[in-house]
Amino acid sequence: MDGELTSGVAARPAVRKLGPGPLVLLAAALLISACGLVYELVAGALASYLVGDTLTRFSTVIGTYLFAMGIGAWLARFVRGDALSRFVEIEIAVGVVGGFSAMLLFAAFAAGVLFQPLLYVLVLAVGILIGIEIPLLMRLLRGDFEFDDLVSRVLSLDYLGALLASLIFPLWLVPQLGLVRTGLAFGLLNIVVAFATLWIFRARLRAPGLWLAAAVSFAALAAGFALAERFSRNAEERLYRGEVVFATQTPYQRVSLMQRGNTVRLYLNGRLQFSSKDEYRYHEALVHPAMSALAQPRRILVLGGGDGLAVREILRHPSVESVTVVDIDAQVTDLFRGQPRLAALNAGSLSDRRVTVVNADAWRWLEARPTSDAPFDAVFMDLPDPSNFGLGRLYSPPFYRLLARHLTADGFLVTQATSPVAAREAFWCIVTTMEAAGFGTAPYHAVVPSFGDWGFVIASRSPYRAPSRLPDGLAFLTPEVLRTLFIFSPDTARLAVEANHLDTQQLVTYYDQGWRRERN
């Protein structure tokens, strides 16, 4: 009976145990994909940090990379000679080009030399080389697997490598290593794959030249990794024209503190946040027009403002009982609370007993805060400019409406609103968006030499009236000066623009277009 049941069933082929050679090549498929994607994420992140326009940078970098991989896959048909030697040669080339790409791009931007052409040349080079490698791997493994099995194994490992890279890049690599060292670390990983291939196939590959090339490349990448922090500081000093006194990559941003003479400047992701020589103009203009218009402001919320400079101005008002600062980056608030010179700049505001610092995402914190808690008399949004979708969402009607639930009926919401000169459309887009959320608005602007003409908006549910009195000891604002801040010249006057909505993020487009126009 058993013979009758099994006679029509084809016998399954025996599972052959894989040797070290095929296992190394399969592992290479995973690592090649991970390395390639990391190189492109590094390039896209660095370009968005330095040039802005995050959506366009990442879209064009990833699109160019995938296109280049297609070119490489087509070119693989023309690769002649020993496929194993060619694979090792290409792996070394990928490690060197990809590993040093962030360093080259940073240096090019700091020197003002052909940054964007170099960006896409490097992306094309890495994509073409990796596009060649995958067909070569299949060629090398075709004797160990049936075709269907080979394709599924190689491609599944390739996609798995991409997944792993996309997860560890933002969660561990960039916060721990930074962009330059991340690129160099994965360059070293490519060279390790080359070494492993040379060793496992040493009986077949008698190529001392490849060993030498791999060793020299490994040494160069290791030296670059060891010197990466010094290189980054030197590049930043050249770019920002000052001495780096502190620089770190946090989970959220690149923080660079520069000093030139007696002036200290803070940069986040390459964008100036303040200069100690004139920050008082910005922070006085941000805080006092609203605070002085309130009879007895007691409870204040600051979103962003981890440098404590806006809090310093808020604490000039004796009626203030509590200030809550919600800033996502603990390393920034710790720096401005613990570093003596910076703490002196903000007058120790973050250590004041009335001040509570919360390191959290502003949107999530507000959603979690019970509406039964006492509302705030004023909210100050001292956030970075809306240069990407992550920041642009904090300038949207849903966020403004969320803030309104935590604001007193006669309270004020104040935001910095970029430059009405350089980014005129973006400035008036913020005004329009606040009005779309149900607020009345009072836009104004002030000249801050480090920034230029800078805009602000006061939003409220009752009419705003400029105060006739301000705190004593201000260096910039007087009641007479304050009244002039609400006057706009014809070249900064209101424009008809769209409101910023979460699905379209028109504000980010306006902002990028305005600042690109200003740079040109």
Regions found by a protein language model. Give the residues of each.
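Alpha-helical transmembrane segments of multi-pass membrane proteins
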Residues: 2-330, 334-342, 347-449, 454-463, ...
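SAM/dcSAM-binding transferase cores
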Residues: 463-520
